[in-house]
């Protein structure tokens, strides 16, 4: 079985990864970045095969956008690796140290998790991000991308692994499962003792499948039914610009807005401005009854729209009585990813920040900033929507755990 063989190789590599010095890891990351640029033609050629195949299968445009690479995106992948190399290495750092009355010194040391399995869909840039972050945090990684991006992933992972091994990274530390049979994923999720953690990145069905079937511990990531609430004191131009950015810039990503809630006192003035701007940009609006009365051209929303992560140029719009109804709606339908309030009212802003139970909560800013790079973490492994171990964009520190180190001078317990 391919996955079991590679998991054993990764497990062996993980022991050596844990003790690598920072200079070796940084050298490898920069060499990997150089290799991506050097072999950019090979990557784009492989990616073209994936895109052509996706177009033949009539995959929607927003998903093809996630799959497609160009020189700029490959350069961004290389830049991400260099940025990771410049970040402080968390491995081996002592978070705190205290001394007991018997003279024992006890501390918490950051250590790698071990072998991390990444299961993801049609975004080949994840291959580079995951390999880079796992390497810098001292972990071995097993990558299992979607079949849509198999040619791209093989090209990228082989280039990265070769470059890493040339600079002293143990062989087996970067593995890609090339078999696209879903049964390989099922096997991967049962490899307790070989794989220490699985992180799924993709749509709701993928994440649900991993959570329900994995016996290996899982960090749940990023289904993003994200909301923006336009409060009655909002500046219209600011609100419109934020909503356009959050919906239109990249509609197929998890931090794009899916539902806009508008305070009833400004709905008659604000909604026509917002709807006109969005429809001119190709966005389909699905509105509540009040929204439809104000803007008859919009489609009528159903209850299903409030719970849908469209990942497309579609936006649900609802008029609410005020912040309390907005908070109730978000509490009911949010996936815990990212929510924003547009307001000039300090009390409402603070209420929103305290009340919304999501990984990232904004005041007067686009939800599109929920991203490891934008948060200053470098590339991210994913955006956790759970509360245990990691929450929000997961950078280097979130890919480590800790152990207690105890320094003595002959103490015995009495």
Curated annotation (Swiss-Prot):
SUPFAM superfamilies in UniProt: ALDH-like
GO cellular component, one term: cytoplasm
InterPro entries the record matches: Ald_DH/histidinol_DH (IPR016161), Ald_DH_C (IPR016163), Ald_DH_N (IPR016162), Aldehyde_DH_dom (IPR015590), G-glutamylP_reductase_CS (IPR020593), Glu-5-SA_DH (IPR012134), GPR_dom (IPR000965)
GO molecular function: glutamate-5-semialdehyde dehydrogenase activity; NADP binding
UniProt keywords, alphabetically: Amino-acid biosynthesis, Cytoplasm, NADP, Oxidoreductase, Proline biosynthesis
Compartments where located: Cytoplasm
Keyword match NADP: yes
Reaction equation(s) it catalyzes: L-glutamate 5-semialdehyde + phosphate + NADP(+) = L-glutamyl 5-phosphate + NADPH + H(+)
GO biological process, one term: L-proline biosynthetic process
Function according to Swiss-Prot or TrEMBL: Catalyzes the NADPH-dependent reduction of L-glutamate 5-phosphate into L-glutamate 5-semialdehyde and phosphate. The product spontaneously undergoes cyclization to form 1-pyrroline-5-carboxylate.
Annotated protein name in UniProt: Gamma-glutamyl phosphate reductase
